[in-house]
Amino acid sequence: MKLNGEHIRFVLDGLRENTTRVRNIKQYLRAILFSGIFMKSSKLPGMLSVKSKKGLDYMDMILKTTDLCKNFKGQMAVNNVSLNIRRNSVYGLLGPNGAGKSTILKMLTGILRPTSGSIEFDGHPWKRNDLEHIGALIEMPPLYENLTAYENLKVRTTLLGLDDARINEVLQIVQLTNTGKKRAGQFSLGMKQRLGIAIALLNSPQLLILDEPTNGLDPLGIEELRELIRSFPCKGITVILSSHILSEVQQIVDHVGIIAGGVLGYEGELRAGEDLEQLFMDVVRRNGKEGY
């Protein structure tokens, strides 16, 4: 998508002159820009119902799903998935291609509405405003390739009324402070991924959702991203990392959930020395490989 200086000034001037319109679209912009997602529809789901369960430590869980289901034209893509994501951890959502991982993440970020089941965020039923506290990078980051890293972030902070000081903060977190006037279109794939994460961090999220962030990266890019993800829990950010690259996941995550055939076949702490590959294959064989 091409965006030049005139386009930016036109948008920003129009928003400044029409404060009523700014108020009306601000919530929608947050849903799109904070999460780093461009949605195909302007419709966002409303509040999702939540069923309480006894015996769970709610203070320790930032996100829970209960019997989450998604049906596409009569075929169950996600079937009664109940996740428990601990605060300030890195949670690996694993599964073969087509297992249902991306469908689950799209329900967590409001892109898809669950057919049934419930989602709870930070101790309350998930609602649209919670997207202000959730950052996400799903698929390729939405970048203006003819703008610099700083300018890409400036577009978002201006539209959303955020302090520009946050731009340098997130650029420092993702180690993109020295890119100067280099345009995003000239960035390596790893740099683009990190800029996408910077966009998702602008709202200081409590939860960061990353869908296959290392896809296509070279070994150096993977190592840089690994160290970045490892640093987030110390900053008070919980990470849900979706991936099928087991060797990489094993070096990053604290807990794992393994999806196969749309079913959660395993969830638990990843202990030192545990054979994740064998566990993964056992779950996949037991539950099948079909899914979305």
List where the protein language model places each region:
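Helical segment within the ABC ATPase nucleotide-binding domain
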Residues: 222-235
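Conserved ABC ATPase "signature" region
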Residues: 65, 154, 158, 164-179
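Catalytic Walker B motif of ABC-type/P-loop ATPase nucleotide-binding domains
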Residues: 208-212
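Conserved ABC transporter NBD signature motif
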Residues: 117-132, 266-268
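Helix-to-loop junction immediately C-terminal to a conserved catalytic motif
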Residues: 109
